[in-house]
Amino acid sequence: MQKVFMIYIDFDDTMYDHKYHWRFDEDFDYNIMFGFGKIPYEEKYLNHELVAKVKNIIEENRKKGIKTLVNLLTGCRTSVYFVSKTNFLDEVVPEFFDQYFSVSSQEDKLPMIQAYNKKIEEEYEIVNTLVIDDGFGVTAQCQDVGYEAMAPGYFEKHYELGE
């Protein structure tokens, strides 16, 4: 069975550093504004350092015969917001992500990871699951079940691929 290294990356303030931030009561309006392009995504706010580090992991794993699957895992209240994120990523980092996932809340991220990993285990042997997310609650939940999980700043500066 082929080995696979699973990576899950959050979008907001992990993969993309937002210029604008909003309160929870404004969240729906901002979802719509980004979703309909009233606030455009800009490539300069993409976390290029994170992308480069993940590409290095992909290459190192390839040399060892390990497949790497990179997945976006983001929270979205509206489908137009999700589509605008994925369209932006397809444009600026084509073929970087293997799969895009959207969940309705941060609490749904861990169950989504577990469900997708279970599906992947039908064909592959998972050697590691790495979660990169700016949300402490998400990383703590993932660490509690044995996944590697960290904030983007820590990942970019300190993460080393294990042997």
Predicted segment positions?
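Conserved Lys-Pro-Asp/Glu-containing loop-to-beta segment of HAD-superfamily phosphomonoesterases
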Residues: 109-137
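Short intrinsically disordered terminal tails
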Residues: 1-2, 163
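His/Asp/Glu-enriched short active-site or ligand-binding loop at hydrolase and phosphoryl-transfer sites
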Residues: 97-110, 134
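Surface-exposed amphipathic alpha-helices with a cationic face
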Residues: 55-62, 117, 139, 143
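Short, aromatic/basic amphipathic alpha-helical patches
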Residues: 84-94, 115-119, 141-146
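Acidic, Mg2+-coordinating phosphoryl-transfer loop and its flanking beta/alpha structural elements
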Residues: 126-163
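Alpha-helical substrate-recognition element adjacent to the catalytic core
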Residues: 2-101
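Residues at the C-termini of beta-strands that transition into short coil/loop
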Residues: 19, 103-104, 153-154
